[in-house]
């Protein structure tokens, strides 16, 4: 199982939001590049990078910064936020992003999403961001009118390589993971799933670990590792030790 440290970029800074609300911002660093290197230095195997400005505007807003982050790391980067056309997807992948997370476009234009998946096999995943099972789009500010159950079969058929599932009500709240919702999602798809929203402590990591055998590829942690309620090196050590036991 992979623990993805999250670096969310807004106005050129590394921030965290609460429940995706644009005005509920905490700035954790004025230097996202340094923060990305920090997590790599602590042992991260992947970086989860989000262009919040892009998510809210629908267009890349931090492209050059993101390219520099990718070039400055030896670990792979997965990126989401504002990827809403084929040209943007191709540009990011050429700039060093290892894989993309697409949400709004995947729901609004499944054919365009399928074309991007076909052009970059294995490198494009779908972001499913939900409140009580109802999916949100455009930076989590609009209701899509659909549920996870509605869209998963089509997205899998379109060629999505993985799913990033965020429980918006728990994002940035450090309130624990919605395990029943995660369990339902894992039962609905054979795609690898990455969970986000609510991871607060090592106990949450321990609670999620058994789901690795059910299709959970990893978890994303943001506020908890920035504020220290989750000790990132300790979480990595726990995962490594459990992997040895299971080998």
UniProtKB/Swiss-Prot annotation:
One of its GO terms (molecular function) is 1-(5-phosphoribosyl)-5-[(5-phosphoribosylamino)methylideneamino]imidazole-4-carboxamide isomerase activity. One of its GO terms (cellular component) is cytoplasm. Pathway: Amino-acid biosynthesis; L-histidine biosynthesis; L-histidine from 5-phospho-alpha-D-ribose 1-diphosphate: step 4/9. The active site is at 8 (proton acceptor), 129 (proton donor). Pfam families: His_biosynth. The keyword Membrane does not apply. Its EC number is 5.3.1.16. Keywords: Amino-acid biosynthesis, Cytoplasm, Histidine biosynthesis, Isomerase. GO terms for biological process: L-histidine biosynthetic process; L-tryptophan biosynthetic process. InterPro entries: Aldolase_TIM (IPR013785), His_biosynth (IPR006062), HisA_bact_arch (IPR006063), Isoase_HisA-like (IPR044524), Isoase_HisA-like_bact (IPR023016), RibuloseP-bd_barrel (IPR011060). It comes from the Bacteria. It catalyses: 1-(5-phospho-beta-D-ribosyl)-5-[(5-phospho-beta-D-ribosylamino)methylideneamino]imidazole-4-carboxamide = 5-[(5-phospho-1-deoxy-D-ribulos-1-ylimino)methylamino]-1-(5-phospho-beta-D-ribosyl)imidazole-4-carboxamide. It is found in: Cytoplasm. Belongs to the HisA/HisF family. NCBIfam families: 1-(5-phosphoribosyl)-5-[(5-phosphoribosylamino)methylideneamino]imidazole-4-carboxamide isomerase. This is 1-(5-phosphoribosyl)-5-[(5-phosphoribosylamino)methylideneamino] imidazole-4-carboxamide isomerase. It comes from Solidesulfovibrio magneticus (strain ATCC 700980 / DSM 13731 / RS-1) (Desulfovibrio magneticus).
């Amino acid at each position: 199982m992979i623990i993805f440290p999250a670096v969310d970029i807004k106005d050129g800074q590394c921030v965290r939001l609460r429940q995706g609300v644009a005005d509920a911002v905490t700035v954790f660093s004025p230097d996202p590049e340094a923060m990305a290197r920090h997590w790599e230095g602590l042992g991260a195997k992947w970086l989860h990078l989000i262009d919040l400005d892009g998510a809210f505007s629908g267009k890349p807003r931090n492209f050059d910064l993101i390219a520099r982050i990718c070039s400055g790391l030896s670990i792979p980067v997965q990126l989401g936020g504002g990827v809403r056309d084929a040209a943007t997807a191709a540009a990011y992948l050429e700039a060093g992003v290892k894989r993309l997370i697409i949400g709004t476009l995947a729901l609004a234009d499944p054919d365009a999403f399928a074309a991007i998946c076909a052009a970059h096999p294995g490198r494009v995943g779908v972001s499913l961001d939900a409140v009580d099972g109802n999916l949100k789009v455009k930076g989590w500010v609009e209701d899509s009118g659909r549920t996870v159950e509605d869209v998963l079969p089509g997205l899998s058929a379109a060629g999505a390589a993985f799913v990033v599932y965020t429980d918006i009500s728990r994002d940035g709240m450090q309130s624990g993971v919605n395990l029943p919702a995660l369990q339902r999602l894992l039962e609905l798809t054979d795609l690898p799933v990455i969970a986000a929203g609510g991871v607060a402590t090592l106990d949450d990591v321990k609670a999620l670990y058994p789901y690795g055998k059910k299709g959970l590829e990893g978890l994303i942690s943001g506020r908890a590792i920035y504020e220290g309620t989750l000790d990132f090196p300790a979480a990595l050590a726990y995962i490594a030790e459990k992997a040895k036991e299971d080998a």
